[in-house]
Design a protein with these regions (language model features):
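Hydrophobic residues within alpha-helices
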Residues: 19-20, 87
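Short gly/ser/thr-rich secondary-structure transition/capping motifs
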Residues: 45-53
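Active-site-adjacent pocket-lining segments in enzyme domains
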Residues: 3-6, 12, 26-36, 53-54, ...
Length: 184
């Protein structure tokens, strides 16, 4: 299965970060949680999470996807990290999957990855992005770029990442009762 890195910055959105990690691990992928500047990262609702590693010491080998959860100011911390910007550009050029949800597309914008791409984000965040084409969809896929609009999009966002990594998510969706959400 694939190797995925999910980056966490202080005051991240817990649903977007933790549910994405959970779903990708359930799908059989190896998911590394990597904190910016700290081994313990606290989310916007005061949930503290111990990371697998920190950005400064993480070993970058055989990575298939990079994922950025949103939340503010967590997404701005991601955007403002020069080393992370370098890695986003590098892995995009390698043809790897890059995914961001909620406010985190501002980091993709700073890295120049939204140019000529369709994307979605939390409503209003698009006003700070002058690249690409904002769609407002729940989840948007443009090549190897995957974006989600916010907390309610997290499950679909994570399933979409898993599918882009080659996983058939139909049994996982059924087992997690996700399909029942779509039935009225």
């Amino acid at each position: 299965m694939a190797n995925v890195v999910v980056f966490f910055a202080q005051v991240f959105e817990e649903i977007e970060g933790l549910a994405t990690v959970d779903i990708l691990r359930r799908a059989g992928h190896t998911v590394h949680t990597v904190g910016l500047g700290s081994e313990v990262i606290t989310g916007s609702h005061q949930i503290s999470v111990k990371m697998d590693d920190v950005l400064d010491t993480f070993y970058w080998a055989d990575i298939d996807a990079l994922v950025l959860p949103g939340g503010l100011p967590g997404a701005t911390h991601l955007r403002d990290d020069d080393f992370l910007m370098k890695k986003l550009k590098e892995y995009s050029k390698k043809g790897k999957i890059i995914a961001a949800i909620c406010a985190a597309p501002i980091a993709l914008h700073r890295a120049g990855l939204l140019k000529d791409k369709k994307y979605t984000c939390y409503p209003g965040v698009e006003k700070d992005i002058n690249q690409g084409s904002y769609t407002g969809h729940l989840v948007e896929v443009d090549g190897k770029l995957i974006t989600g609009c916010g907390p309610a999009a997290t499950f679909e966002f994570a399933y979409t990442i898993a599918e882009a990594l080659g996983t058939d998510t139909s049994a996982l969706r059924e087992g997690m009762q996700y399909n029942k959400l779509l039935k009225k």
